[in-house]
Amino acid sequence: MIEIEKVCVDFTAGRGTPTRAVDDVSLHIAAGEIFGIVGTSGAGKSTLLRTLNALTRPSQGRVNVNGVEISALDGKALRQARQRIGMIFQHFNLMHTRTVAQNVAFSLKAAGWERSKIAPRVAEILTLVGLADKANRFPVQLSGGQKQRVGIARAIANHPDVLLCDEPTSALDLETSATILALLRQINAQLGITIVLITHEMNVIKSICDRVAVMSGGKVVESGEVFDVFAHPQHAFTQQLVSHTLNLTLPERLREHLPGQLLKILFIGDSAEQPVLSEVAIKFGVAVNILHGKIEYIGERALGILVVQLTAPHNPTAVAAAVEHIRQRTAQVEVIRG
C-alpha cells in the first residue's frame, strides 16, 4: 500500500545550513491497517506524514502509494493521486462561513462529482460520523469533537484509500478523544481505509493502532506491532515513552528504604491472568507486597506490569527461589533493587 524508501527531508532558511527534519526513513504500511507514528515535538513525524500526499517533497528517497511514486508526480497526475488520500488536521481547518454539509460537499465538488450525487453522499457520510442532525449548523456552533467529525467526513467523502491523521485528538479532551478514536476504528473496519496517524501520545497508539513507528531526531528508532513495542521496547527513547505511559515510576523514598527485593514483572497473555504471586507466597513462604501495577489490554492481548516487594527475613534463599519461579512463569523480571 505505502512504501517509504530512504526518505530524507531538508529545510533551508535563507543561506543557512540545511536542517534535516526526516533522516533516512524507510517504512512499509500495509493496506487496511492503522499505522501510528509517535514522537515528541520536532521529531519529524508531521513532515514525514506530509510526504505521503506530497504536501512536502522528499529531498532524497521515494514515497509510493498504491504502486504510484507520488513523490515524483505533479500537476494533474498529483491532483488525481491526492483524491485517493484524505487528511484530517489537529485544528480541523473548516470553512467557518459554510455549513457542515457545505464543508463536506466542497471536497466532492473539488473532486468533480456530479451535482446530483453530492447531496446524497453528504447525507450518507454525515450519518456515518454521527452528524446527520448537524448538517445545517456552522462550525462556530459545534464542539471540538463535532468539528473533528466534520473534518473526518470531508476527508473520507470521496472514497479515499488512505486517511492521514495529523494529531487528530491533541486539541480535544480525553473523553472526546476516545470517541474520535472509536470513530476512526469504525471507519477503518467498515470502509477498509488505511489510516496513518501521528501523535505524541502513546495512549493514542495503544488504543487504536496495529503497528507503530517511533521517531526521534528525524529518525525511526523503533517500529513493530504495538503490543510488542509496549511489551519489549528496545530503544531508550521508546522505553521512556512506554514507562511514562504506563506510569510505573516508584518514588525514590520507596526504592531506598523498603527491605527485601524490588522486582518489576512483565506478564504477557495468559500469564497476566494467572495467580503467580499467590503461588510464590504459598510455595516459598515469602511476603509479597504489590507496590504498583496494572493490566492493559492492547487489542485483545493482555499486558500486565507489576512492581512488587519480596521479603523473607528468616529465609533469604526463599526470596531467590521465588524470583526464579516468577521468571519461569512470566515474560520478564527486572530486579530493581536487592
Swiss-Prot record:
Gene3D superfamilies: 3.30.70.260, P-loop containing nucleotide triphosphate hydrolases. It is a peripheral membrane protein. Coiled coil: none annotated. Its main location: membrane. Pfam families: ABC_tran, NIL. Keywords: Amino-acid transport, ATP-binding, Cell inner membrane, Cell membrane, Membrane, Nucleotide-binding, Translocase, Transport. It catalyses: L-methionine(out) + ATP + H2O = L-methionine(in) + ADP + phosphate + H(+); D-methionine(out) + ATP + H2O = D-methionine(in) + ADP + phosphate + H(+). SMART domains: AAA (SM00382), NIL (SM00930). It is found in: Cell inner membrane. Residues 2-242 form the ABC transporter domain. GO terms for molecular function: ABC-type D-methionine transporter activity; ATP binding; ATP hydrolysis activity. GO terms for cellular component: plasma membrane. Its EC number is 7.4.2.11. ATP binds at residues 39-46. It is an enzyme of class 7 (translocase). Belongs to the ABC transporter superfamily. Methionine importer (TC 3.A.1.24) family. The complex is composed of two ATP-binding proteins (MetN), two transmembrane proteins (MetI) and a solute-binding protein (MetQ). Part of the ABC transporter complex MetNIQ involved in methionine import. Responsible for energy coupling to the transport system. This is Methionine import ATP-binding protein MetN 2. It comes from Salmonella typhimurium (strain LT2 / SGSC1412 / ATCC 700720). The lineage of its organism: Bacteria, Pseudomonadati, Pseudomonadota, Gammaproteobacteria, Enterobacterales. The gene is metN2.
